[in-house]
Swiss-Prot record:
GO biological process, any: cilium assembly
Taxonomic lineage: Eukaryota, Metazoa, Ecdysozoa, Nematoda, Chromadorea
InterPro entries in UniProt: Centriolar_ciliogenesis_assoc (IPR052319), HYLS1_C_dom (IPR027918)
Organism, as annotated: Caenorhabditis elegans
Annotated localization: Cytoplasm, Cytoskeleton, Microtubule organizing center, Centrosome, Centriole; Cell projection, Cilium
The protein's name in its UniProt record: Centriolar and ciliogenesis-associated protein hyls-1
C-alpha cells in the first residue's frame, strides 16, 4: 500500500479543519484508513483518467471541463426537456394570476443539448422564486383585507357617533350621558387606544398605538382604582406597635447609679463631663 500523505501533512490538514488527535495509535489508524481509501479510489479509476483529479463541479455545469466529461460518459439528453421558467403575472380583481409563457430561447439547440443541467437548475430556481412570491402575495392580501375591514368598522363607528350626537342634542343632556355610557361599554377596552395605519406596508402591523388616548384611558383607570396609600401604612404601624407592647418595658430607677460610666482618664473639658 502506497503512502499518499505524510503524518505532518495529515496533521496540518486536521488542524486547519479544527480537529485534534492526541493519541498516536488513533492517529496511525486514521492515516491507514485514509491511505486505504485513496488506494481504493486509485484502483477503481481507469488508466487514462484519474478520479482524484476530476472536478467536483463538473456535474453542475460550472466547470469548463464539464462538456468534455459529459461527451465521454454519454449523458442522456432526451428526457431533460424542461418547461420554460418565465412566468407572467396578470391582475384579476384583487388577486394575481400567474401563467407560464413559452418564449423563444436565446440559445440554439446545440447549446441546450450541451448544457441540459443548466436548464434544469434554472427551472428549479424560478419555481422556488415563484413559490416565495405566492407566499408574499398571500400575506399582503391578508393584511390588506384586515386593513379594509378595520377602515369599514371605523367609518361605521364614526357614522354612529354622528347619529348619537344628533339624537342627544335633540333629546337632552340626560340621554347624551346614557348614550355615551352605552357607547363606552359597547367598545372593547383593548381597542380603545389603537388606530388603523393609513398606508399599509408589507411586514408592518396593520394598527398602531395612540399614546394620548392610552394615557387618558390609564388616567381614568387610576382615578377609579387608586393605589393603597396612607391607610395601608397606618395599619402596618399599628401592627408594629401592638407587637412591641406585648412585653413590659423595664422601668428605670433614678437612685441606681450602676449605669453611669467610670472614666479613668482625666478629660480636659471637665465642665462638659459635669
Amino acid at each position: 500500500m502506497a503512502n499518499f500523505t505524510t503524518e505532518n501533512e495529515l496533521e496540518d490538514i486536521l488542524h486547519q479543519m479544527g480537529h485534534h488527535i492526541h493519541d498516536k495509535n488513533q492517529f496511525a489508524t486514521f492515516k491507514n484508513e485514509i491511505d486505504n481509501l485513496l488506494d481504493r479510489e486509485l484502483c477503481l479509476s481507469d488508466a487514462d483518467e484519474d478520479v482524484m483529479n476530476e472536478s467536483l463541479f463538473a456535474s453542475l455545469s460550472v466547470d469548463p471541463a464539464a462538456q468534455f466529461i459529459r461527451q465521454e460518459r454519454n449523458f442522456p439528453t432526451e428526457n431533460l426537456n424542461i418547461q420554460s421558467p418565465i412566468v407572467s403575472r396578470k391582475r384579476q380583481g384583487k388577486r394575481f394570476i400567474y401563467e407560464n409563457v413559452e418564449l423563444q430561447s436565446d440559445f440554439d439547440d446545440e447549446s441546450s443539448n450541451e448544457y441540459p443541467e443548466r436548464n434544469l437548475l434554472v427551472d428549479r430556481a424560478w419555481r422556488s422564486i415563484h413559490r416565495a412570491m405566492e407566499t408574499c402575495n398571500g400575506a399582503t392580501e391578508t393584511l390588506k383585507s384586515i386593513s379594509l375591514d378595520g377602515s369599514d368598522i371605523q367609518e361605521r363607528s364614526s357614522v354612529d357617533d354622528e347619529e348619537n350626537i344628533a339624537e342627544s342634542v335633540s333629546v337632552g343632556l340626560s340621554t347624551e350621558t346614557e348614550q355615551s355610557e352605552l357607547q363606552k361599554s359597547s367598545r372593547p377596552e383593548k381597542e380603545v387606544w389603537t388606530r388603523n395605519v393609513l398606508s399599509l406596508e408589507p411586514g408592518r402591523a396593520p394598527k398602531k398605538y395612540d399614546p394620548v388616548t392610552r394615557y387618558h384611558f390609564y388616567k381614568s383607570e387610576w382615578d377609579r382604582h387608586p393605589a393603597p396609600g396612607e391607610m395601608r401604612r397606618l395599619s402596618l404601624r399599628w401592627k408594629v406597635r401592638e407587637f412591641m407592647l406585648r412585653h413590659d418595658v423595664p422601668r428605670l430607677n433614678e437612685n441606681n447609679e450602676d449605669w453611669k460610666a467610670n472614666h479613668d482618664k482625666d478629660w480636659s473639658p471637665r465642665p462638659y463631663i459635669d
